[in-house]
From Swiss-Prot:
Residues 17-159 form the Globin domain. The keyword Calcium does not apply. Disulfide bonds: none annotated. This is Globin CTT-W. It holds the Pfam family Globin.
Length: 159
């Protein structure tokens, strides 16, 4: 029931926040090809996240950063984010965003990923965005408002 209430609020929020999409898309377009750097930043800030990835657990981050395996996995993560960003701001496809987020949350929950790890990932990711894009109050607000809605869906599953 909690999930359905959150989902309903997110759909309503998507309509109310169409004005946020241009800020999210503009900033994302500045970093969406920095896949390796984004994941490297997350792993550097929170090694416990790196340890959740069997292919990278216990390995030297500096050594794996340059590998094809790291590049492929980084691209997989950032491509998912790009898909979400491409849909943001279009109320007609909000249910698609919600379904993508639900699937991702369920997949990660099955692997033992916690809400706390997702929060840490988000902190590192937002730090990367702020330091690698043209960042202002409107951009920050857009990411916060839309991000909070998306996180509510993910967290409702991980809790």
């Amino acid at each position: 029931m909690k999930f359905l209430v959150i989902l309903t609020l997110c759909i309503a929020g998507a309509i109310a926040h169409c004005d946020k999409a241009p800020f999210i898309k503009a900033s994302w377009n500045q970093v969406k090809h920095n896949e390796v750097d984004i994941l490297y930043t997350v792993f550097k800030a929170y090694p416990e996240i790196q340890d959740r990835f069997p292919q990278f657990a216990g390995k030297d981050l500096e050594a794996i950063k340059e590998t094809a395996e790291f590049a492929v996995h980084s691209t997989r993560i950032v491509s998912f984010m790009s898909e979400i960003v491409s849909l943001v701001g279009n109320p007609a496809v909000q249910s698609s965003i919600d379904l993508l987020l639900v699937k991702m949350a369920n997949d990660h929950k099955a692997r033992g990923v916690t809400k706390e790890l997702f929060e840490k990932f988000n902190i590192a990711f937002m730090g990367y965005l702020k330091s690698h894009t043209t960042w202002d109050k409107k951009t920050e607000n857009a990411w916060k408002v839309v991000g909070d809605e998306h996180h509510a869906i993910v967290y409702s599953i991980l809790e």
